[in-house]
Amino acid sequence: MGIKVYKPTTNGRRNMTSLDFAEITTSTPEKSLLVSLKSKAGRNNNGRITVRHQGGGHKRHYRLIDFKRNKDGVEAVVKTIEYDPNRTANIALVHYTDGVKAYIIAPKGLEVGQRIVSGPDADIKVGNALPLANIPVGTVVHNIELKPGKGGELVRAAGASAQVLGQEGKYVLVRLQSGEVRMILGTCRATIGTVGNEQQSLVNIGKAGRSRWKGVRPTVRGSVMNPNDHPHGGGEGKAPVGRKAPSTPWGKPALGLKTRNKKAKSDKLIVRRRNEK
């Protein structure tokens, strides 16, 4: 999928880019796989803002994605490649030979008419899903499970990929995009290939309005707020923070504080941290 560049006919168009959607084959989703989505605008059941900078935007339907890929031995044909407003990756509509329809994350190189299959005996081919123990060393994968049968949780964003490095007993070593090397059970499934639509990260929004269409509201700096709204607020003119370190709106340390639980049980499964050389 290529990048479309606009002429600077207005200030908002200057430097604006978008995807050309050349890979998209239809604009009409499969109705049986749609679920309504209610806009929460970042509020909880009490009406209080729990997630800032959310609200407005275009209405969306949620597409039911098959992250489990557990129909072993049943072949499926790719019917369409579609846009999904709920994620950066594109999705593919597949029709199984037993009549079931499903959406999957569209990997790079997947084409309409291509046949895919899941199961331990599946070929090492883009779009096929297998247990990690059955995938050769060096293979690039995505949509990786953390618990067998739960469905893919890792490596699902556009352009993301991970690589199988080896096997240690019942675990398989996988290098994630961040550089982290992690042990994952060999019975967990993964899909062959890299997630498609990798150029979406190169898009220049161009104007604030495009963010509002996506439901993203403005981010206001704490230093321009009043002191009752933010610890950085108040003062005359461009005043400094006035604290030893920058703070969140709720007075917690910001910028650099580690938030991971020091007693996380999954620590023993991380062979190499993402920030280690």
UniProtKB/Swiss-Prot annotation:
Presence of keyword RNA-binding: yes
Entry keyword Cell division: no
InterPro entries referenced in this protein's UniProt entry, alphabetically: NA-bd_OB-fold (IPR012340), Rib_uL2_dom2 (IPR014722), Ribosomal_uL2 (IPR002171), Ribosomal_uL2_bac/org-type (IPR005880), Ribosomal_uL2_C (IPR022669), Ribosomal_uL2_CS (IPR022671), Ribosomal_uL2_dom3 (IPR014726), Ribosomal_uL2_RNA-bd_dom (IPR022666)
Biased segments, Basic and acidic residues type: 264-277
Coiled coil: none
Annotated GO MF terms: rRNA binding; structural constituent of ribosome; transferase activity
GO biological process, one term: cytoplasmic translation
Key words of the record: Ribonucleoprotein, Ribosomal protein, RNA-binding, rRNA-binding
Highest taxon listed in the record's lineage: Bacteria
SUPFAM superfamilies assigned: Nucleic acid-binding proteins, Translation proteins SH3-like domain
SMART domains: Ribosomal_L2, Ribosomal_L2_C
PROSITE patterns, per database record: RIBOSOMAL_L2 (PS00467)
Function (record text): One of the primary rRNA binding proteins. Required for association of the 30S and 50S subunits to form the 70S ribosome, for tRNA binding and peptide bond formation. It has been suggested to have peptidyltransferase activity; this is somewhat controversial. Makes several contacts with the 16S rRNA in the 70S ribosome.
Protein name: Large ribosomal subunit protein uL2
Organism: Streptococcus pyogenes serotype M4 (strain MGAS10750)
Highest classification ranks of the organism: Bacteria, Bacillati, Bacillota, Bacilli, Lactobacillales
